Amino acid sequence: MSDALIAPNASSSEAPQSPAEHYDPTRKQKSADKTARIPIKIVPAEKLKKPDWIRVKAATGNSRFYEIKDILRANNLVTVCEEASCPNIGECFGKGTATFMIMGDKCTRRCPFCDVGHGRPDPLDVNEPGNLARTIAQLKLNYVVITSVDRDDLRDGGAQHYVDCISQTRELSPATRIEVLVPDFRGRLDKALDILQACPPDVMNHNMETVPRLYKQARPGADYAHSLKLLQEFKRRNPNVPTKSGLMVGLGETDEEILEVMRDMRAHDIDMLTIGQYLAPSNHHLPVLRYVHPDTFKMFEEEAYKMGFTHAAVGAMVRSSYHADQQAHQAGFA
Protein backbone atom coordinates (compact mmCIF):
# COMPACT_ATOMS: atom_id res chain seq x y z
CA MET A 1 0.00 0.00 0.00
CA SER A 2 1.45 3.10 -0.47
CA ASP A 3 0.90 6.35 0.97
CA ALA A 4 1.14 4.57 3.59
CA LEU A 5 4.17 3.84 3.20
CA ILE A 6 6.24 6.92 2.97
CA ALA A 7 6.62 8.46 6.37
CA PRO A 8 8.67 11.09 8.24
CA ASN A 9 11.46 10.36 10.67
CA ALA A 10 9.70 9.75 13.95
CA SER A 11 9.70 7.31 16.80
CA SER A 12 6.84 4.87 17.13
CA SER A 13 4.38 5.78 19.85
CA GLU A 14 4.15 2.18 21.00
CA ALA A 15 6.75 0.73 23.33
CA PRO A 16 8.63 -2.20 21.76
CA GLN A 17 8.29 -5.67 23.18
CA SER A 18 11.36 -6.94 24.96
CA PRO A 19 12.90 -10.15 23.55
CA ALA A 20 11.80 -11.99 26.67
CA GLU A 21 8.23 -10.79 26.41
CA HIS A 22 5.78 -13.40 25.15
CA TYR A 23 4.99 -12.88 21.48
CA ASP A 24 1.34 -12.00 20.97
CA PRO A 25 0.33 -12.15 17.29
CA THR A 26 -2.87 -10.22 18.01
CA ARG A 27 -0.92 -7.23 19.33
CA LYS A 28 -0.24 -4.50 16.79
CA GLN A 29 3.52 -4.44 16.20
CA LYS A 30 5.24 -1.24 15.19
CA SER A 31 8.81 -0.15 14.54
CA ALA A 32 11.37 -2.60 15.99
CA ASP A 33 8.73 -5.20 16.92
CA LYS A 34 7.49 -5.27 13.34
CA THR A 35 10.81 -5.40 11.52
CA ALA A 36 12.57 -7.79 13.93
CA ARG A 37 10.87 -10.85 12.43
CA ILE A 38 11.37 -10.23 8.72
CA PRO A 39 13.97 -12.34 6.85
CA ILE A 40 15.78 -9.23 5.61
CA LYS A 41 18.22 -7.71 8.07
CA ILE A 42 18.03 -3.93 8.22
CA VAL A 43 21.57 -2.60 8.17
CA PRO A 44 21.92 0.84 9.76
CA ALA A 45 23.39 3.49 7.50
CA GLU A 46 24.88 6.87 8.21
CA LYS A 47 22.00 9.25 8.73
CA LEU A 48 21.86 11.75 5.91
CA LYS A 49 21.19 15.38 6.65
CA LYS A 50 17.74 16.36 5.48
CA PRO A 51 18.03 18.93 2.68
CA ASP A 52 16.29 22.29 2.61
CA TRP A 53 13.70 21.17 0.06
CA ILE A 54 12.19 18.63 2.48
CA ARG A 55 9.61 20.78 4.22
CA VAL A 56 6.37 19.69 5.89
CA LYS A 57 3.40 22.06 6.12
CA ALA A 58 1.90 22.14 9.61
CA ALA A 59 -1.79 22.55 10.33
CA THR A 60 -2.81 26.15 10.92
CA GLY A 61 -4.80 27.36 13.91
CA ASN A 62 -7.96 27.89 11.87
CA SER A 63 -7.75 24.59 9.99
CA ARG A 64 -10.12 21.61 10.25
CA PHE A 65 -7.39 19.35 11.68
CA TYR A 66 -9.02 18.58 15.04
CA GLU A 67 -12.54 18.58 13.61
CA ILE A 68 -11.53 15.85 11.16
CA LYS A 69 -9.85 13.81 13.90
CA ASP A 70 -12.94 14.04 16.11
CA ILE A 71 -15.26 12.95 13.30
CA LEU A 72 -13.04 9.98 12.45
CA ARG A 73 -12.92 8.81 16.07
CA ALA A 74 -16.66 9.24 16.51
CA ASN A 75 -17.25 6.94 13.53
CA ASN A 76 -14.59 4.39 14.52
CA LEU A 77 -12.60 5.04 11.34
CA VAL A 78 -8.88 4.83 10.64
CA THR A 79 -6.85 6.93 8.20
CA VAL A 80 -3.63 5.93 6.54
CA CYS A 81 -2.56 9.52 7.19
CA GLU A 82 -2.27 8.71 10.90
CA GLU A 83 -1.30 5.03 10.76
CA ALA A 84 1.54 5.58 8.28
CA SER A 85 2.71 8.82 9.92
CA CYS A 86 2.28 10.69 6.66
CA PRO A 87 4.23 13.97 6.61
CA ASN A 88 1.36 15.79 4.91
CA ILE A 89 -1.27 15.03 7.56
CA GLY A 90 -1.39 18.59 8.90
CA GLU A 91 -2.02 20.08 5.48
CA CYS A 92 -4.55 17.48 4.35
CA PHE A 93 -6.58 17.32 7.56
CA GLY A 94 -6.40 21.10 7.68
CA LYS A 95 -8.13 21.25 4.28
CA GLY A 96 -10.75 18.70 5.29
CA THR A 97 -9.37 15.76 3.30
CA ALA A 98 -8.21 12.33 4.42
CA THR A 99 -7.37 8.92 3.00
CA PHE A 100 -9.53 6.35 4.74
CA MET A 101 -7.96 3.01 5.68
CA ILE A 102 -10.45 0.17 5.88
CA MET A 103 -10.29 -3.39 7.25
CA GLY A 104 -8.48 -2.48 10.46
CA ASP A 105 -5.07 -1.14 11.43
CA LYS A 106 -3.07 -4.40 11.47
CA CYS A 107 -1.44 -5.49 8.22
CA THR A 108 -0.52 -9.08 7.42
CA ARG A 109 2.71 -7.91 5.76
CA ARG A 110 5.85 -6.49 7.38
CA CYS A 111 7.25 -4.15 4.71
CA PRO A 112 10.25 -2.45 6.39
CA PHE A 113 9.64 0.95 4.79
CA CYS A 114 6.09 1.22 6.11
CA ASP A 115 4.88 2.46 9.49
CA VAL A 116 1.49 0.73 9.43
CA GLY A 117 1.32 -1.84 12.24
CA HIS A 118 1.61 -5.60 11.70
CA GLY A 119 -0.31 -8.31 13.49
CA ARG A 120 -3.12 -10.83 13.25
CA PRO A 121 -6.02 -8.74 11.93
CA ASP A 122 -9.33 -8.48 13.71
CA PRO A 123 -12.51 -9.71 12.00
CA LEU A 124 -13.96 -7.28 9.49
CA ASP A 125 -16.27 -4.66 10.95
CA VAL A 126 -19.58 -5.11 9.15
CA ASN A 127 -20.58 -1.59 10.15
CA GLU A 128 -17.50 0.00 8.60
CA PRO A 129 -18.91 0.59 5.08
CA GLY A 130 -21.91 2.42 6.56
CA ASN A 131 -19.78 4.42 8.99
CA LEU A 132 -17.46 5.38 6.15
CA ALA A 133 -20.31 6.42 3.87
CA ARG A 134 -21.90 8.58 6.58
CA THR A 135 -18.58 10.21 7.41
CA ILE A 136 -17.90 11.10 3.78
CA ALA A 137 -21.40 12.55 3.49
CA GLN A 138 -20.96 14.48 6.76
CA LEU A 139 -17.68 15.96 5.53
CA LYS A 140 -19.26 16.78 2.14
CA LEU A 141 -16.23 15.45 0.28
CA ASN A 142 -16.16 15.65 -3.51
CA TYR A 143 -13.27 13.22 -3.86
CA VAL A 144 -12.15 10.46 -1.51
CA VAL A 145 -9.37 7.89 -1.41
CA ILE A 146 -10.01 4.52 0.23
CA THR A 147 -7.08 2.25 1.01
CA SER A 148 -6.47 -0.70 3.31
CA VAL A 149 -4.00 -2.89 5.06
CA ASP A 150 -3.08 -6.17 3.34
CA ARG A 151 -5.52 -8.89 4.39
CA ASP A 152 -3.88 -12.14 3.31
CA ASP A 153 -6.15 -13.88 5.83
CA LEU A 154 -9.27 -13.24 3.74
CA ARG A 155 -10.29 -15.49 0.85
CA ASP A 156 -10.89 -12.50 -1.43
CA GLY A 157 -8.15 -10.28 0.03
CA GLY A 158 -10.86 -7.86 1.14
CA ALA A 159 -12.27 -7.14 -2.33
CA GLN A 160 -15.90 -7.51 -1.24
CA HIS A 161 -15.35 -5.09 1.64
CA TYR A 162 -14.00 -2.55 -0.87
CA VAL A 163 -17.12 -3.01 -2.99
CA ASP A 164 -19.36 -2.57 0.05
CA CYS A 165 -17.56 0.67 0.96
CA ILE A 166 -17.76 2.01 -2.59
CA SER A 167 -21.43 1.14 -3.09
CA GLN A 168 -22.61 2.51 0.26
CA THR A 169 -20.62 5.71 -0.24
CA ARG A 170 -22.24 6.20 -3.64
CA GLU A 171 -25.69 5.70 -2.15
CA LEU A 172 -25.22 8.65 0.23
CA SER A 173 -22.87 10.75 -1.92
CA PRO A 174 -23.60 9.99 -5.59
CA ALA A 175 -21.51 12.92 -6.84
CA THR A 176 -18.39 11.93 -4.89
CA ARG A 177 -15.57 10.46 -6.95
CA ILE A 178 -13.87 7.45 -5.35
CA GLU A 179 -10.26 6.40 -5.78
CA VAL A 180 -9.10 3.13 -4.24
CA LEU A 181 -5.51 2.30 -3.34
CA VAL A 182 -5.61 -1.49 -3.15
CA PRO A 183 -3.21 -4.19 -1.92
CA ASP A 184 -1.89 -6.75 -4.40
CA PHE A 185 -4.52 -9.46 -3.68
CA ARG A 186 -1.71 -12.01 -3.72
CA GLY A 187 -2.92 -15.51 -4.59
CA ARG A 188 -6.48 -14.36 -5.23
CA LEU A 189 -6.16 -11.81 -8.03
CA ASP A 190 -8.80 -13.17 -10.41
CA LYS A 191 -11.34 -13.59 -7.61
CA ALA A 192 -10.71 -10.07 -6.33
CA LEU A 193 -11.03 -8.52 -9.79
CA ASP A 194 -14.24 -10.47 -10.44
CA ILE A 195 -15.70 -9.01 -7.24
CA LEU A 196 -14.56 -5.46 -8.03
CA GLN A 197 -16.40 -5.68 -11.36
CA ALA A 198 -19.66 -5.31 -9.41
CA CYS A 199 -18.81 -1.75 -8.38
CA PRO A 200 -15.55 -0.44 -9.82
CA PRO A 201 -14.00 2.76 -8.43
CA ASP A 202 -13.50 5.97 -10.37
CA VAL A 203 -9.70 5.59 -10.15
CA MET A 204 -7.84 2.32 -9.52
CA ASN A 205 -4.51 2.77 -7.71
CA HIS A 206 -1.95 0.17 -6.68
CA ASN A 207 1.56 1.26 -5.81
CA MET A 208 4.60 -0.45 -7.31
CA GLU A 209 6.61 1.30 -4.54
CA THR A 210 10.14 0.59 -5.78
CA VAL A 211 12.29 -0.98 -8.50
CA PRO A 212 12.31 -4.78 -8.99
CA ARG A 213 15.89 -5.15 -7.72
CA LEU A 214 14.80 -3.89 -4.29
CA TYR A 215 11.57 -5.87 -3.96
CA LYS A 216 12.97 -8.62 -1.75
CA GLN A 217 14.37 -5.98 0.57
CA ALA A 218 11.51 -3.47 0.59
CA ARG A 219 8.41 -5.51 -0.26
CA PRO A 220 8.88 -9.05 1.12
CA GLY A 221 5.85 -11.05 0.11
CA ALA A 222 5.10 -8.94 -2.96
CA ASP A 223 5.99 -9.57 -6.60
CA TYR A 224 6.83 -6.89 -9.17
CA ALA A 225 5.31 -8.70 -12.16
CA HIS A 226 2.17 -9.52 -10.19
CA SER A 227 1.61 -5.86 -9.27
CA LEU A 228 1.91 -4.84 -12.92
CA LYS A 229 -0.50 -7.62 -13.91
CA LEU A 230 -3.06 -6.46 -11.35
CA LEU A 231 -3.27 -3.00 -12.89
CA GLN A 232 -3.13 -4.23 -16.48
CA GLU A 233 -5.86 -6.82 -15.94
CA PHE A 234 -8.10 -4.32 -14.16
CA LYS A 235 -7.63 -1.92 -17.08
CA ARG A 236 -8.49 -4.64 -19.57
CA ARG A 237 -11.75 -5.28 -17.74
CA ASN A 238 -12.49 -1.59 -17.12
CA PRO A 239 -10.99 0.36 -20.03
CA ASN A 240 -12.71 3.61 -19.02
CA VAL A 241 -11.41 3.62 -15.44
CA PRO A 242 -7.98 5.29 -15.09
CA THR A 243 -5.23 3.31 -13.41
CA LYS A 244 -2.56 4.82 -11.19
CA SER A 245 0.62 3.78 -9.41
CA GLY A 246 3.33 5.31 -7.24
CA LEU A 247 7.03 5.02 -6.54
CA MET A 248 9.26 6.23 -3.75
CA VAL A 249 12.90 7.15 -4.23
CA GLY A 250 15.76 7.05 -1.76
CA LEU A 251 16.00 3.31 -1.06
CA GLY A 252 19.09 2.72 -3.17
CA GLU A 253 17.61 2.69 -6.66
CA THR A 254 19.17 4.49 -9.62
CA ASP A 255 17.49 7.09 -11.81
CA GLU A 256 17.60 4.71 -14.77
CA GLU A 257 15.87 2.00 -12.74
CA ILE A 258 13.05 4.43 -11.95
CA LEU A 259 12.73 5.30 -15.64
CA GLU A 260 12.61 1.60 -16.51
CA VAL A 261 9.76 1.03 -14.04
CA MET A 262 7.92 3.97 -15.59
CA ARG A 263 8.31 2.33 -19.01
CA ASP A 264 6.96 -0.93 -17.59
CA MET A 265 3.98 0.96 -16.16
CA ARG A 266 3.09 2.45 -19.52
CA ALA A 267 3.55 -0.94 -21.19
CA HIS A 268 0.91 -2.23 -18.75
CA ASP A 269 -1.56 0.58 -19.48
CA ILE A 270 -1.07 2.59 -16.28
CA ASP A 271 -2.36 6.13 -16.80
CA MET A 272 -1.28 8.18 -13.77
CA LEU A 273 1.96 8.32 -11.79
CA THR A 274 3.21 9.61 -8.44
CA ILE A 275 6.84 9.74 -7.32
CA GLY A 276 7.97 11.01 -3.91
CA GLN A 277 10.92 10.95 -1.53
CA TYR A 278 11.11 8.05 0.94
CA LEU A 279 11.45 9.22 4.55
CA ALA A 280 12.22 6.55 7.15
CA PRO A 281 9.55 6.24 9.88
CA SER A 282 12.15 5.25 12.49
CA ASN A 283 15.69 3.96 12.91
CA HIS A 284 14.26 0.44 12.75
CA HIS A 285 13.01 0.89 9.19
CA LEU A 286 14.98 0.92 5.95
CA PRO A 287 17.34 3.90 5.95
CA VAL A 288 17.22 6.77 3.48
CA LEU A 289 20.17 6.23 1.13
CA ARG A 290 19.76 9.41 -0.91
CA TYR A 291 17.70 12.58 -1.07
CA VAL A 292 16.68 13.16 -4.66
CA HIS A 293 17.24 16.71 -5.90
CA PRO A 294 14.27 18.72 -7.24
CA ASP A 295 15.95 18.85 -10.65
CA THR A 296 15.84 15.05 -10.81
CA PHE A 297 12.17 15.02 -9.85
CA LYS A 298 11.58 17.51 -12.66
CA MET A 299 13.36 15.18 -15.08
CA PHE A 300 11.14 12.27 -13.98
CA GLU A 301 8.06 14.42 -14.52
CA GLU A 302 9.13 15.50 -18.00
CA GLU A 303 9.95 11.92 -18.99
CA ALA A 304 6.59 10.73 -17.65
CA TYR A 305 4.67 12.98 -20.00
CA LYS A 306 6.91 11.97 -22.90
CA MET A 307 6.02 8.34 -22.14
CA GLY A 308 2.31 9.13 -22.29
CA PHE A 309 1.16 9.30 -18.68
CA THR A 310 -2.00 11.41 -18.48
CA HIS A 311 -0.81 12.93 -15.21
CA ALA A 312 2.41 12.79 -13.20
CA ALA A 313 2.65 14.17 -9.65
CA VAL A 314 6.36 14.18 -8.94
CA GLY A 315 8.22 15.85 -6.07
CA ALA A 316 9.85 15.29 -2.71
CA MET A 317 6.66 15.54 -0.63
CA VAL A 318 4.33 13.93 -3.17
CA ARG A 319 2.44 10.91 -1.86
CA SER A 320 0.03 8.63 -3.66
CA SER A 321 -3.06 10.23 -2.15
CA TYR A 322 -1.66 13.75 -1.71
CA HIS A 323 -3.92 16.15 -3.63
CA ALA A 324 -5.40 13.09 -5.35
CA ASP A 325 -8.47 15.11 -6.30
CA GLN A 326 -6.30 17.66 -8.09
CA GLN A 327 -4.33 14.88 -9.81
CA ALA A 328 -7.52 13.31 -11.14
CA HIS A 329 -8.95 16.68 -12.19
CA GLN A 330 -5.79 17.69 -14.05
CA ALA A 331 -5.80 14.33 -15.81
CA GLY A 332 -9.40 14.96 -16.86
CA PHE A 333 -10.92 12.18 -14.75
CA ALA A 334 -12.67 14.25 -12.06
From Swiss-Prot:
GO cellular component: cytoplasm
Biased composition (Basic and acidic residues): 21-36
MF term (GO), any: metal ion binding
Alphabetical keyword list: 4Fe-4S, Cytoplasm, Iron, Iron-sulfur, Metal-binding, S-adenosyl-L-methionine, Transferase
Cofactor: [4Fe-4S] cluster
Domain Radical SAM core: from-to ranges: 92-310
PROSITE patterns listed in its UniProt record: RADICAL_SAM
Documented EC number(s): 2.8.1.8
InterPro entries per UniProt: Aldolase_TIM, Elp3/MiaA/NifB-like_rSAM, LIAS_N, Lipoyl_synth, rSAM
SMART domains: Elp3
Positions of the UniProt region annotated as Disordered: 1-36
Catalytic reaction equation(s): [[Fe-S] cluster scaffold protein carrying a second [4Fe-4S](2+) cluster] + N(6)-octanoyl-L-lysyl-[protein] + 2 oxidized [2Fe-2S]-[ferredoxin] + 2 S-adenosyl-L-methionine + 4 H(+) = [[Fe-S] cluster scaffold protein] + N(6)-[(R)-dihydrolipoyl]-L-lysyl-[protein] + 4 Fe(3+) + 2 hydrogen sulfide + 2 5'-deoxyadenosine + 2 L-methionine + 2 reduced [2Fe-2S]-[ferredoxin]
Record's subcellular location: Cytoplasm
Residues that coordinate or bind [4Fe-4S] cluster 1: 81, 86, 92, 321
Chain intervals with Low complexity compositional bias: 7-20
Annotated cofactor note: Binds 2 [4Fe-4S] clusters per subunit. One cluster is coordinated with 3 cysteines and an exchangeable S-adenosyl-L-methionine.
Pathway terms, separated by semicolons: Protein modification; protein lipoylation via endogenous pathway; protein N(6)-(lipoyl)lysine from octanoyl-[acyl-carrier-protein]: step 2/2
Annotated residues for binding of [4Fe-4S] cluster 2: 107, 111, 114
Pfam families with a match to the protein in the record: LIAS_N, Radical_SAM
Family: Belongs to the radical SAM superfamily. Lipoyl synthase family.
UniProt-recorded name of the protein: Lipoyl synthase
Naturally occurring in which organism (per UniProt): Cupriavidus taiwanensis (strain DSM 17343 / BCRC 17206 / CCUG 44338 / CIP 107171 / LMG 19424 / R1) (Ralstonia taiwanensis (strain LMG 19424))
